[in-house]
């Protein structure tokens, strides 16, 4: 199928109505503490190996081989993102891979898509996820009277 057809299909499939990303009127200025190298290391160690790389082509195994050097570089980048609230443009991009479903796969809707995201971006996402989880564990059980993970 033509590249343009796939581009239009995935844009329509994943399009969301989001607020203007350039409008920072409601930005929180007093953020949580700085990101720690230990958070970066923990996030990096938690990323599954033997997975396809994102658009940057950097496999997670390279970060894991470089160990402390990679942690220091990723920590610096993650800290910059945390302070400026600006996500690198390359980290916002994903590569979509169509995988045919059973049957006749002549239409885009007969495929499922997976998205390949930069492993460096995943490190920051895992840090944010861990911080949100800690916050929710700390705040929500008191408010809701339930423990996360045991809602249903």
What feature does the model see in each segment?
Residues 2-6, 144-152:
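Short, compositionally biased segments
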Residues 125-126, 133-149:
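Electropositive, glycine- and tryptophan-enriched low-complexity nucleic-acid-binding patches
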Residues 1-110, 115, 119-123:
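Surface-exposed loop/turn segments and immediately adjacent short secondary-structure elements
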